């Protein structure tokens, strides 16, 4: 009997040691978002996939998902993050070779860039006496656009300025002058590609056209702010106003380009200008850039406007 108990104890100890040494082996964690750019308050799917690739079960698995501040559940509006840690806590049991997906519908209310930064996993051993901790870093980004400003006077202001032009354009066909060619960036419509020039140069080139009677507009966003206490509030209002102006220009079919002395961070690059264009793709590019903008300033207002004035094409003026 003593020998039997000794052998049983040895087997339990070996199983305990093996499970402790390998409890986190073969575990994979992956975060997935069904959208990369959203409106303020627009819900999106946030899915965590846990895959146990080994045959050994995981009797206790606690996950701490590192999530962005301000994330709330779509159904009830409750904060996703725990008050104590700021992370989202989940506890699971995994069978051997089991794959589990946790899908949540969530939303973010404020403009900006947000990051899901992976998981800290804590797993228990065979007897539940010890735990092992491992971090699985990850970086998933989502961008929230600025909200429209609700500027009620904007349609009237732009309508009065552009109304005469719209009437003339409906009566006469615009003469078009091709000024040259430039490299295709992916934002231009396919009809603007010059297939002859592209074949000659072995790369996509688009025509730079000048509509001789066409009205176009340059939107300038100056982010230099001297009121440090209200900087965030005032700049957020500016981002929303730029969005409303772009959307109104889209409604009136007026081509526009966008320039700023602000910093637009992230995957789009640190660009400061979007060329002249029109259409949903052009608008979405501007809105994503506004969502990515920080409160930093690349140059002062004087230097920014001076550079704009020097680069004006003939027929354009700075008001």
Where are the predicted features?
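Generic surface-pattern signal
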Residues: 172, 186, 291-295, 310-313
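An amphipathic, basic-hydrophobic helix/alpha-beta surface used to engage anionic
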Residues: 11-268
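Residue-level signal for secondary-structure boundary elements
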Residues: 189, 254-257, 295-302, 317
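Exposed acidic/Ser/Thr-rich ligand/metal-binding surfaces
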Residues: 303-319
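Short, charged loop segments at secondary-structure junctions
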Residues: 267-306
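Alpha-helix initiation/capping motif
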Residues: 68, 146-147, 174, 279, ...
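Short, conserved, surface-exposed binding loops centered on an aromatic residue
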Residues: 209-211, 248-250, 277-280, 308-312
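Membrane-targeting alpha-helical segments
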Residues: 1-8
């Amino acid at each position: 009997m003593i020998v039997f108990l000794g052998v049983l104890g040895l087997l339990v100890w070996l199983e305990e040691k093996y499970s402790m040494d390998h409890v986190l082996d073969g575990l994979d964690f992956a975060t997935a978002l069904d959208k990369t750019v959203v409106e303020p308050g627009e819900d999106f799917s946030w899915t965590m996939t846990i895959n146990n690739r080994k045959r050994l079960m995981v009797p206790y698995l606690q996950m701490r998902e590192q999530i962005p501040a301000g994330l709330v559940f779509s159904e009830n509006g409750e904060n996703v993050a725990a008050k104590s840690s700021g992370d989202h806590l989940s506890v699971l049991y995994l069978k051997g070779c089991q794959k589990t997906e946790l899908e949540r519908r969530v939303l973010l209310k404020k403009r900006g860039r947000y990051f899901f930064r992976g998981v800290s996993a804590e797993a228990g051993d065979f007897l539940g006496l010890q735990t092992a901790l491992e971090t699985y870093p990850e970086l998933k980004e989502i961008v929230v656009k600025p909200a429209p400003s609700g500027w009620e006077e904007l349609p009237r202001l732009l309508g009065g300025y552009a109304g005469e032009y719209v009437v003339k354009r409906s009566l006469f066909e615009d003469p078009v002058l091709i000024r040259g060619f430039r490299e295709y960036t992916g934002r231009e419509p396919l009809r603007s590609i010059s297939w002859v020039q592209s074949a000659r140069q072995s790369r996509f080139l688009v025509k730079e056209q000048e509509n001789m009677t066409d009205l176009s507009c340059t939107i300038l966003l100056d982010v230099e702010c001297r009121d440090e206490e209200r900087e965030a509030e005032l700049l957020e209002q500016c981002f929303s106003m730029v969005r409303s102006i772009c959307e109104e220009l889209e409604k009136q079919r007026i081509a526009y380009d966008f320039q700023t002395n602000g910093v637009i961070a992230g995957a789009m690059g640190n660009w400061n200008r979007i060329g002249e264009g029109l259409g949903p793709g052009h608008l979405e590019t501007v809105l994503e850039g506004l969502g990515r903008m920080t409160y930093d300033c690349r140059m002062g207002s004087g230097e920014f406007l001076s550079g704009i004035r020097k680069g004006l094409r003939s027929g354009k003026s700075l008001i």
